[in-house]
Amino acid sequence: MPLAVGTKAPDFTLPTKTAEGPKQIKLSDNFGKKNTLLLFFPMAFTGTCTEEMCSLTPALPNYEGMNAVVYGISGDNPFAQEAWSQKEKIGVALLSDYEHKVARDYGVAYDSFLPQKNLGMAGVAKRSAFVIDTNGVIQYAESSDDPGQLPNFDKIKAKLAELK
């Protein structure tokens, strides 16, 4: 079950790969400055995940205008995320939760991803969204067991506009 609205967001530091090289992103660096949109997704190089991240790229200025920073989080390693980002021209900062700790801390890790296919993949992130305010408190939370269901971006934008 995902963390509830009103809960203090668990802090984390995760790696990302930028054009300048590897970099560590710490969630709490945004506290006191910016709202944060965390978008957990199962895996890079998959259809719905590509659709989600690619559709966000042209909308990033809108999120910046709402005083929000956007991070995509998956269990892929940062080099795979970078390759996917370059191939698909994804502008969202992608963070690697390679050990699935952050997905577990936020209550959005599958016990078994696609069990009907016997993939044996525990810990994969469910498609989820969290809006965290400048005080580090979760103001919006959404998670789906259906990896094909995109988050409700209208509700996310409405919450961010409210927090602006």
Question: Where are the predicted features?
Answer:
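Chalcogenol-based redox active-site neighborhoods
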Residues: 1-164
